[in-house]
């Protein structure tokens, strides 16, 4: 995979700042023999007034985010040689000292309290060229230093990759309590967890609407599985459609349709309906069990699980239900497919002969399979892709307890994003923040 840092206007300047020159960006080739993370220094952020603690936390989270991305070699601040009190204007920065510690990039920031929230003034420099290349003023509501940090990290990633960052995104999941099921969301790195909904009936399979305004879930509030939607604007929780025994709903990439599963007697088929719950119709009519639909990013195909071959396998068909073909031929228990937003891979869970569950990816056209996890606990399952298609999150029982882990698309870097034991299930990575 290639992440380009090519010629482009780099400066998104403050109104009061002078225009910045458009720098030449070197190219990062991710996954190739030539790839190396960009060495970057994140200096101690300057807190104005009573924002000192917020500035410290913001810098720490920015560093952690950049490490998690896998694109950067984030240098240890204990080895910095530069004067912490040096200014922000390029002439006041001793770039040679930053170069001496191995930095190619340098991030600095001011953090202060503004009307209704925190403000951060992010400055980014190319050390070897000795110039400032980005100035960005960011604001968040309240005193949420983590959110400010995620937005800063997103800007740094955007500068170097010309792609949106994913650090301000949220993860939805289901948490089982004592007699309750909760729909929760959290930052992609595990922070800022919030309970959206607490039910005494089963909740399953959260799925985000592409615009992030709603989360679709399977609810047993009526005693049987049905599709319900949680709306953020007014916290409403309402049923969608009239199908009973409906579960596992997922929005199409444009948000106009929902694919889902209906179980009627001994028949379990895939259906589709409009996003408002109208116009439901069958997509499959096979005697086998068809479940777990996932859309291709162009909305033209659907991958799903079927046991029509005798064991659960991944299949792909047209979004109208036509042309179903088997995709996986290895293993005898493959489930929970998730199509990458980049379109090049489908992540899924497979169980081997030892009854161990692991995460794999398969190319939707060639059927080539790669393994993401191996000998890392007995359960690695329920993968969900980040909106950039470069990272995924899944559930694992490694290290003696259930955790959520973020991995790259090759499984080379796997980072726990929940501390200790957690009872979160069915993680669903949300869309890019507006």
From Swiss-Prot:
Disulfide bonds: none annotated. It is found in: Periplasm. The keyword Cell division applies. Residues 411-434 are annotated as: Disordered. GO terms for cellular component: periplasmic space. GO terms for biological process: cell division; protein import. Its main location: periplasm. Keywords: Cell cycle, Cell division, Periplasm, Signal. Residues 1-21 form the signal peptide. The Tol-Pal system is composed of five core proteins: the inner membrane proteins TolA, TolQ and TolR, the periplasmic protein TolB and the outer membrane protein Pal. They form a network linking the inner and outer membranes and the peptidoglycan layer. Belongs to the TolB family. Part of the Tol-Pal system, which plays a role in outer membrane invagination during cell division and is important for maintaining outer membrane integrity. This is Tol-Pal system protein TolB. It comes from Anaeromyxobacter dehalogenans (strain 2CP-C).
